[in-house]
Amino acid sequence: IYMDNKSTVEDVYNTIRSKKVHQIPITAFGKKIIGIVNKKVILNLLMNDIENAQEILKRKIEDIYLPEILTAEPESDVRKVVQIMLDLKLDAIPIVDENDVLMGIVSKTDILKAVSHLPKLQLWS
């Protein structure tokens, strides 16, 4: 799931809610990732200018501040990706190719599901 930078703030918020995701990558020029937005970013934007909330919802998502994002490549060491997610308290990291074109997103849930399928660990004391 991703949204184009020409989407409205309202469309992005509604997609986050309807798809039950925590955040959504924003792309431009095809699928080149330019940012990532979550509900908190949108709600803070609305709360900081409550009198103009309806106007803000109609704005294009590219017109609001998109925080810098960390990305990973498909070949990235999953342990390093997990460590970065833990250190920076990230819920997910977008996966991009060498041209920053969005290929997917890896979330904490994805990692936990993958780990749950590993063989059981044997602990010795």
Regions found by a protein language model. Give the residues of each.
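A generic helix-loop boundary/linker signal
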Residues: 2, 32, 54-55
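The conserved cystathionine-beta-synthase
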Residues: 2-21, 27-28, 71-89, 96, ...
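A glycine-centered beta-loop-beta connector
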Residues: 16-19, 24-41, 85, 93-110
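Tandem CBS (Bateman) regulatory domains
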Residues: 38-73, 77-87, 102, 107-125
